[in-house]
Amino acid sequence: MAELACFCYPHLENDSYKFIPFNSLAIKCMLTAKVDKKDQDKFYNSIIYGIAPPPQFKKRYNTNDNSRGMNYETSMFNKVAMLVCEALNSIKVTQSDVASVLSKVVSVRHLENLVLRRENHQDVLFHSKELLLKSVLIAVGHSKEIETTATAEGGEIVFQNAAFTMWRLTYLEHKLMPILDQNFIEYKITVNEDKPVLESHVKELIAELRWQYNKFAVITHGKGHYRVVKYSSVANHADRVYATFKSNNKNGNMLEFNLLDQRIIWQNWYAFTSSMKQGNTLDVCKRLLFQKMKRESNPFKGLSTDRKMDEVSQVGI
């Protein structure tokens, strides 16, 4: 995750802002600079290489002292930064909005995936600039629309029906912020259209999840799509979701946290996110992840008869 201010800076033109991507040498200069505490939140002028991000975001970049940040010296950083600017320059951002826009915390991997979709000649985003920019504005939290299948970050499609598409995420292959754990396996489920879903299509998805992905929990980050993750990584997701939720609220980016369909979401995660929305502390919310929940009445009782036993997946074992 990183703030949009890690990729670009605003330049006032008439009554609105134009966004300009950072270059890697300016960032490198900022990372070595000694800056007064009072100036930590201001864009840094490297004198030679132009404007750099505010020093308060140093930890967002990969250095000798911090291996968890972005690989900002890669060509992928330039591509992501330019794509972000392209999207922001397609809308009007005024002086009253600019701080809020740049403070938004976004998924770096999501943005890299959109670059990969853009470069894929077989992908609809390669052919439609309008859809591409729409996808980026959704990814950076500027649009109130949810991420649907057409505007999704992408990956490898492993399941699809009339209402849902399930993607295997390809973060292991990323350049900007790759997942280093070779055992990483995670999925995302997007709705094909933002409209009510037929019960039969929900039933098809739940049957697929129950039989093929029975070692995984279905959760949500509140953005209108589902994530299918290993139970061992749920606590880590909880920390990230809670931190992003609090950060967005603090910065005035009050986006509605979408709890999604309770029939699909893992019961404990639904309890965690509901508690978070009520304003409880992280410790109080996380306790709900490890409590034994009373089973809800199952609207799809007898669903297991839809599949034969030899279809049970070994994914995640």
Curated annotation (Swiss-Prot):
It is found in: Host cytoplasm. The keyword rRNA-binding does not apply. The active site is at residue 225. GO terms for cellular component: host cell cytoplasm. Belongs to the rotavirus NSP2 family. Homooctamer. Interacts with VP1; this interaction is weak. Interacts with NSP5; this interaction leads to up-regulation of NSP5 phosphorylation and formation of viral factories. Interacts with host DCP1A, DCP1B, DDX6, EDC4 and EIF2S1/eIF2-alpha; these interactions are probably part of the sequestration of some host SGs and PBs proteins in viral factories. Participates in replication and packaging of the viral genome. Plays a crucial role, together with NSP5, in the formation of virus factories (viroplasms), which are large inclusions in the host cytoplasm where replication intermediates are assembled and viral RNA replication takes place. Displays ssRNA binding, NTPase, RNA triphosphatase (RTPase) and ATP-independent helix-unwinding activities. The unwinding activity may prepare and organize plus-strand RNAs for packaging and replication by removing interfering secondary structures. This is Non-structural protein 2. It comes from Rotavirus A (strain RVA/Human/Indonesia/69M/1980/G8P4[10]). The lineage of its organism: Viruses, Riboviria, Orthornavirae, Duplornaviricota, Resentoviricetes.
